[in-house]
Regions:
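Acyl-donor-binding surface of acyltransferase catalytic domains
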Residues: 1-43
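Conserved catalytic-core motifs of GNAT/GCN5-like acyltransferases
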Residues: 1-5, 144-159
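Conserved acyl-donor/pantetheine-binding loop and adjacent beta-alpha core of acyl/acetyltransferases
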Residues: 45, 49-53, 57-89, 93
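Conserved active-site alpha-helix within GNAT-family acetyltransferase domains
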Residues: 129-149
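Short low-complexity, flexible loop/linker segments enriched in glycine and/or proline
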Residues: 160-164
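Conserved GNAT acetyl-CoA-binding A-motif
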Residues: 117-129
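Conserved acetyl-CoA-binding loop-helix of GNAT-fold acetyltransferases
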Residues: 93-116, 135-136, 140
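Intrinsically disordered, low-complexity, positively biased terminal segments
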Residues: 1-16, 115, 121, 169-183
Length: 183
């Protein structure tokens, strides 16, 4: 699973305007539950545990959502969890509704979150290997891929870093993972 980061002060690429696009932190638990196909109880639990839900709109239609974790993050498929240090945010559980894909909503939602979460200096995000749409949207939003989770025999073994930058090392520290290889 490739991991990317964006740090406050990094440039954000200019994205062409998308008419009527808006995105904001949401308190509408019913709408979030409907979009994410989760119970309102699950949405409330996420919010109470330090997760911020964002919804993107075109006109008044909700078209995408995503979450920012500020206390604890995790990758449920790997049974992996981690504590998030202050001034860091982990971006997770994003979805653009199928009928709205291919319009550049995802990178705009990521940038909107960066603009609105002013208390976060370092944003972290991962995506499934082979998910080229996510990889493209994350890159287009201005994130840099710095490492890849190393999984063998169904277990998370550590992190392979892409290069020797301070950000690559910071990713190992953020996720509390050993460095098992460099690429």
């Amino acid at each position: 699973m490739p991991l990317g980061t964006w740090w406050r002060g990094d440039p954000l690429p200019d994205l062409s305007p998308l008419q009527t696009f808006s995105a904001s932190l949401s308190t509408d638990t019913q709408m979030i539950a409907r979009l994410a196909n989760l119970s309102e109880q699950e949405i409330n639990t996420r919010i109470q545990t330090g997760n911020h839900p964002y919804i993107a709109f075109l006109d008044d239609a909700p078209v995408a959502y995503g979450w920012v974790a500020l206390r604890e993050g995790g990758i449920s498929e790997l049974q992996f969890s981690f504590t998030i240090p202050p001034r860091n945010g982990y971006l997770w559980d994003f979805l653009t509704l199928p009928q709205w894909r291919g319009r550049g909503i995802y990178p705009r939602l990521l940038q909107a979150i960066i603009h609105q979460e002013q208390l976060v200096d370092h944003f972290w995000i991962g995506y499934q290997p082979g998910n080229e749409a996510s990889a493209h949207g994350i890159n287009k939003a201005g994130f840099h891929v710095v490492g890849d989770l190393v999984i063998s025999e169904g277990r998370l073994r550590g992190l392979a870093l892409f290069g020797s930058s301070g950000r690559a090392q910071a990713s190992a520290d953020f996720f509390h993972l050993p460095i098992v290889a460099g690429k």
